[in-house]
Amino acid sequence: MGIRPPPGERSPAAVLSFGVVNLDKPPGPSAHQVSAWIRDLVGVEKAAHAGTLDPKVTGCLPVLTGTATRIAPALLEGFKEYVAVLELHDDPPRILPDVIEAFTGEIYQKPPKKSAVARRLRTRTVYDLDVLDVDGRQVLLRIRCESGTYIRKLCHDIGRALGTNAHMGHLRRSATTPFDDTDLVTLHDLADAVAWLRDTDDTEPPDAPADALRAAVQPAERALTHLPRLTIADSAAHEVATGAPVYAPGVIDTTALPTPPADGALVACYTAGGTAVCLGRLVGDPDADAGVVVALERVLV
């Protein structure tokens, strides 16, 4: 089984078949709907979004295309960042800063009634909660939190703690590990890039349509940049492609691993050229002479 070329050497078709779109989701359609639109637009069999957004919510929604959908579990590792409008039902009291600070750190949440998960009390971590602006009864918040935090419920609970009651107004996701809103792509951007590539002729600069596509669809390796990484030999990569784990003799570079690496950590393995080969759990010493180092979870080639 062949190993795909390094990210910078792939054809447009190869990028589409193993790519990621950092989509600026518009209000209205569901996350599932925009994923289906992207699937049909780029002409792949499947596409998957990472971290759902409600129809009214806008912002950062990574969409994986083709075989890159195998990467989806890796995007559960990390944080989310939102900008939300807290709509108070009365004038903001003086205790607003103190109440906001009290909701930083570990909090308790019960999923809302319409949630797809069991409504059991659980803990989530709010890493940062900042007031960006106050305009009358509207409070603009920036929230950096653990995946799975319900922002609508957070706004409701803040309102109760303030004694004014409150609900969530507009919500926009500004980041989801490892993506943020600095390089978002709209559906129109993507459609234009795909159309340009398909309709190009000899009068066009030879690389311009492909460059436009690569600006809209990034190699899927972009979705793994937050994970610890191991570099493995090409011979080991070919063995992984057939389902074998990563053995110690096949590891050629560990400099991108944390020191000391945590047992059971999710890691990404690459060739020396930068092609993602697999995701797996670190189960052995990568500096050892023998033994299994990475137990496979997803083969990416």
From Swiss-Prot:
**Residues forming the catalytic site:** 54 (nucleophile)
Catalytic activity from the UniProt record: uridine(55) in tRNA = pseudouridine(55) in tRNA
Entry's EC annotation: 5.4.99.25
Going by the record, the broad EC class of this enzyme is isomerase
Choose any GO biological process term that the UniProt entry carries and state it.
Answer: tRNA pseudouridine synthesis
UniProtKB keywords: Isomerase, tRNA processing
Q: Which domain of life is it from?
A: Archaea
Occurrences of domain PUA (ranges): 227-301
Return any one Pfam family short name.
TruB_N
Q: Which GO terms describe its molecular function?
A: pseudouridine synthase activity; RNA binding; tRNA pseudouridine(55) synthase activity
* Cited InterPro entries: Dyskerin-like (IPR012960), PsdUridine_synth_cat_dom_sf (IPR020103), PsdUridine_synth_N (IPR002501), PUA-like_sf (IPR015947), PUA_sf (IPR036974), tRNA_PsdUridine_synth_B_fam (IPR004802), TruB_arch (IPR026326), TruB_C (IPR032819)
Reported function: Could be responsible for synthesis of pseudouridine from uracil-55 in the psi GC loop of transfer RNAs.
- Can you tell me which family this protein belongs to? Belongs to the pseudouridine synthase TruB family. Type 2 subfamily.
Q: Give the PANTHER family listed for this entry.
A: CENTROMERE/MICROTUBULE BINDING PROTEIN CBF5, H_ACA RIBONUCLEOPROTEIN COMPLEX SUBUNIT DKC1
This one is known as Probable tRNA pseudouridine synthase B
State the organism named in the record.
Answer: Halobacterium salinarum (strain ATCC 700922 / JCM 11081 / NRC-1)
Q: Identify the taxonomic lineage of the organism of origin.
A: Archaea, Methanobacteriati, Methanobacteriota, Stenosarchaea group, Halobacteria
Identify the gene encoding this protein. truB
